[in-house]
Amino acid sequence: MAAGVDCGDGVGARQHVFLVSEYLKDASKKMKNGLMFVKLVNPCSGEGAIYLFNMCLQQLFEVKVFKEKHHSWFINQSVQSGGLLHFATPVDPLFLLLHYLIKADKEGKFQPLDQVVVDNVFPNCILLLKLPGLEKLLHHVTEEKGNPEIDNKKYYKYSKEKTLKWLEKKVNQTVAALKTNNVNVSSRVQSTAFFSGDQASTDKEEDYIRYAHGLISDYIPKELSDDLSKYLKLPEPSASLPNPPSKKIKLSDEPVEAKEDYTKFNTKDLKTEKKNSKMTAAQKALAKVDKSGMKSIDTFFGVKNKKKIGKV
């Protein structure tokens, strides 16, 4: 699916290529604003990020971008530079609501949700309140109060204890999905955490939990991620048990140290080796030939000839 966006530069609409499910394409046909791109807060960084709302089914999707250098798209009769591939994946809106609940918790009181989810920078956050089943979702991360005799409003307050239990379930669900899809995570955990080879092989279940924790941490604040790590009783990565130097993975920008002496393949060393090697019978016969009057092949590639070549 290619979507046109006017960049306002007079060049025309810039097109973006999206990989979406068929039912999302149908939503754009049923309603004029069936699919809506909005800028909302990233619950991990607090910065802005692009999300996709399915207004027909009231669903929220995060927009991811896959990019490589020197790629372009051929769209109908045009060429779109950049070669970016956008794809939309469902995201639990509770992750975004957590950002506002944690922020409102500093006031230390119960509040109605429409007073909690308020953002002058990202005003479209009110769309989160229109998502179905919101009250059931909030039950996982908040304490609730309400008096039906006075009004039908409910008041919410962030609960860290409930949130950690909910996040633990998310981690367990992620672990199950990783195993079902036969995703090998031990090498990834080992390379990022500097675990020894023996430790990574014996703690396979822990590797899955640690990797799942890392995935979930992309949707929650850093402080909450640290609390979740403690709640899951994940040990701190051990830097005191490195692998042998020949197997150690370097995570710096510096090149990995060579395991062999590659200098033996240098041109200078090869010439020296040729001089020291014994001459064959043919080479000895060639050495006895009278070379007077002959020009060395190097003369054809001397300084003068190089200048001529440079002028061409």
Curated annotation (Swiss-Prot):
Pfam families: RNase_H2-Ydr279, Ydr279_N. InterPro entries: RNase_H2_suB, RNase_H2_suB_wHTH, Rnh202_N. Gene3D superfamilies: 1.10.20.120, 2.20.25.530. The keyword Oxidoreductase does not apply. The modification N-acetylalanine is found at A2. Changing Y219H: In AGS2; heterozygous compound with a nonsense mutation; reduces stability of the RNase complex. It is found in: Nucleus. The modification Phosphoserine is found at S296. GO terms for biological process: fibroblast proliferation; gene expression; in utero embryonic development; mismatch repair; negative regulation of gene expression; positive regulation of fibroblast proliferation; regulation of DNA damage checkpoint; regulation of G2/M transition of mitotic cell cycle. Widely expressed. Coiled coil: none annotated. The modification N6-acetyllysine is found at K295. Keywords: Acetylation, Aicardi-Goutieres syndrome, Disease variant, Nucleus, Phosphoprotein. The keyword Methyltransferase does not apply. One of its GO terms (cellular component) is ribonuclease H2 complex. Residues 236-256 are annotated as: Disordered. The RNase H2 complex is a heterotrimer composed of the catalytic subunit RNASEH2A and the non-catalytic subunits RNASEH2B and RNASEH2C. Belongs to the RNase H2 subunit B family. It is linked to Aicardi-Goutieres syndrome 2: A form of Aicardi-Goutieres syndrome, a genetically heterogeneous disease characterized by cerebral atrophy, leukoencephalopathy, intracranial calcifications, chronic cerebrospinal fluid (CSF) lymphocytosis, increased CSF alpha-interferon, and negative serologic investigations for common prenatal infection. Clinical features as thrombocytopenia, hepatosplenomegaly and elevated hepatic transaminases along with intermittent fever may erroneously suggest an infective process. Non catalytic subunit of RNase H2, an endonuclease that specifically degrades the RNA of RNA:DNA hybrids. Participates in DNA replication, possibly by mediating the removal of lagging-strand Okazaki fragment RNA primers during DNA replication. Mediates the excision of single ribonucleotides from DNA:RNA duplexes. This is Ribonuclease H2 subunit B. It comes from Homo sapiens (Human). The lineage of its organism: Eukaryota, Metazoa, Chordata, Craniata, Vertebrata. The gene is RNASEH2B.
